[in-house]
């Protein structure tokens, strides 16, 4: 009985420490050097397109750097072996994936399946995602939706390569936010850097890739049938319901709450105290630097710092001038 109570107390102590993670850098044909030059994330090449900041997906597992007792563990292993840190969740796999993307060139025009299609055909979750635009070069744009009224019209426009008749292009600037549910035709344009919050899935169906070739000189695969299967017809309108809370000179802006996750920006000027009531919270610094105070202990936060506030953390204080994107599963 005494040993059980001691074990429980130790777990309570561990739960009040943030879990910091090392990102996994992914080389992409469309990637560049901004992750290295602007975020200090040096990868294996000059075409690093993605930093998987918080990930338990088998294609790129983030590694815990602190606290010391978990250092070196993959997030997937931590989630499986210490479910108490995550509120003993019902999800078998860690449900979210947080990325920073540097699009030096256009990404392919693509779409992702929902859970039902993804599990049946790919053996993994579908992929609903959303984007916060960290930076955008002048004239930058994205593909966000399509103009076809039916599957037949969609397939006809794709087959004839009438991309301007099919695709909806939207100009973007820093601070924009986009909800990208599964079934949405989309592509990030050249010169755009985003933070992406998504379901933990790596399934993408390409519709158009600008006739690019891979490093072996082969055309990149397209997935036209699967894309047509999962795309919305006609493309629905999407409206954000943004909630802004002013806290002194700081702001808390909730951009999105859906069946998979809630995404919020913490804009810190000098100091911001936050109360947390969800099972656990993910956060990544996208601008500035400062400190995280938790139970009287300060933790340095720098650009691209990514961490999880585990179950049991009910209040934090952020100090400095910095911006973070936070999220938690539904």
Residue ranges and their predicted role:
Residues 93, 101-106, 115, 125, ...:
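Ligand-binding loop in jelly-roll beta-barrel domains
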Residues 100, 108-110, 130-132, 169, ...:
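Conserved hydrophobic/aromatic beta-strand scaffold that supports enzyme active sites
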Residues 132-154, 252-255, 268-279:
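Short beta-strand/loop turn elements enriched in aromatics
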Residues 156-164, 289-291:
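Short, structured beta-strand/loop micro-motifs enriched in basic residues and often containing a Trp
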